[in-house]
Regions:
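Non-catalytic architectural context of zinc metalloproteases
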Residues: 2-55, 87-88, 155-168, 184-186, ...
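Alpha-helical structural elements
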Residues: 4-5, 25, 32, 65, ...
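Auxiliary, metal-adjacent structural segments of Zn-dependent hydrolase domains
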Residues: 41-103
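Active-site-flanking segments in enzyme catalytic domains
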Residues: 79-232
Length: 232
């Protein structure tokens, strides 16, 4: 009803949404685009299209299963309450798997993003909410000191051509090519593997002290937010 959509708009600042599912164990409210929406300022606008019911049916179980791993207490601390399902998500005309906005407690997920990395991308975007919610944690300066001396990240995640999301077995401090783009993306990539592929990550990091330091850093910072947090 229009009352609901007005309330949803008031809370999330996104138009054209309706409720999809309110029965989560951790308080997340799942919303979906009823028609396409476009929000934000011109050079940084976010746009996304209405998803088909079939696509939602295929992906919703996966999204919910992954997000149900987070306790309500933790989600409240990182300001995540609303998850918006849509497809063909873009920021400033660049395709993206998700858009987190901790100020309105909302994570937008493109349910049609690359299925190979879909589950991992959920945790990747959730990490950005944690990072954005805590200015005093996840120091980029500390993180950059883990890398070899002459390594430099790009100015921003979209101003580099380091975009491959597949696992680098011979890691040398970086788990994917995309993790070489910025410190923030590097952290989110490591966190996403910690949540979805810890077995592989543990094997790789045995021979990679840089990666091992990065994993330990993420554990210690996440535990400062919630010391009961479980990665498994």
């Amino acid at each position: 009803s229009s009352v609901y959509s007005n309330t949803i708009y008031y809370l999330t600042k996104i138009p054209n949404l309706k409720i999809h599912d309110l029965n989560s164990s951790n308080g997340i409210k799942y919303l979906k685009a009823e028609k396409s929406f476009k929000v934000g300022i011109v050079e940084n606008n976010v746009q996304c299209n209405k998803p088909s019911e079939n696509d939602i049916k295929n992906k919703f179980k996966i999204i919910k299963k992954n997000l149900e791993r987070y306790e309500k207490v933790f989600l409240e601390k990182i300001n995540l309450k609303y998850v918006v399902l849509c497809e063909n998500l873009k920021v400033a005309d660049i395709k993206t798997a998700g858009v987190p906005n901790h100020k309105v407690k909302t994570l937008i997920i493109d349910i049609k993003s690359d299925p190979r990395y879909f589950e991992r991308s959920i945790h990747h975007e959730l990490f950005h909410m944690a990072d954005d919610s805590y200015d005093n944690l996840f120091s980029y300066d500390k993180w950059e000191k883990f890398n070899i001396l002459d390594f430099q990240y790009a100015e921003c995640s979209t101003c580099s051509n380091r975009s491959d999301l597949s696992l680098i077995k011979d890691s040398n401090g970086f788990i994917t090519e995309y993790s070489m783009s910025t410190a923030s993306e590097d952290m989110a990539e490591v966190f996403s593997f910690m949540m979805t592929d810890m077995d592989n990550l543990s094997i790789i990091s045995q021979d990679d002290s840089i990666l091992n330091n990065k994993i330990n850093f993420i554990v210690s910072e996440i535990q400062k937010i919630d010391n009961n947090f479980k990665f498994k």
